[in-house]
């Protein structure tokens, strides 16, 4: 049983051996193929093939420790500061005011205070309530002009859309009939 147990690192020992020879065979012929591959460099027939093969992982890591461009012979340490590449500095951006019709910022914004509407003259208001439009009643400048007696406005059916009004003479007898 101990002879059948494999060394876990034996897989890497046969680095570079062709897998086509041992694809259908069991583990014992693979070991035999590995031994042949290990002794092949000494024989003259397989010497050319050994030169073309890459070195095994152990040999490779023994020979290469650091890349030459990282090595600083004075300090014998990697000089990382020499290899740092800094991004170019961007100039500070200047603040430009956008031209728009938006509301200005709060510092410069002041609300325009509208004056209160003019107060209604109470004499005119009470005069209108009690229909006391005598000679001594105050006159409102905004009030419409009254028609002289004997005239009234009449709207015709044809001109309802235009709201045009016509003035006609009313006889004193007709005015009394319409009021009743």
UniProtKB/Swiss-Prot annotation:
Residues recorded as bearing Phosphoserine in the entry: 156
Residues the record lists as Phosphotyrosine modifications: 130
Pfam family, one: DUF4660
Alphabetical keyword list: Phosphoprotein
Ranges annotated as biased composition (Basic and acidic residues): 48-61, 161-180
Sequence ranges of Acidic residues compositional bias: 149-160
Transmembrane segments: none
Family: Belongs to the UPF0690 family.
Name of the molecule in the record: UPF0690 protein C1orf52 homolog
Keyword match Phosphoprotein: yes
Modified residues (Phosphothreonine): 65
Superkingdom of source: Eukaryota
InterPro entries per record: DUF4660 (IPR029089)
GO cellular component: nucleoplasm
Keyword Phosphoprotein part of the UniProt annotation: yes
Region: Disordered, residue numbers: 1-66, 96-180
Origin species: Mus musculus (Mouse)
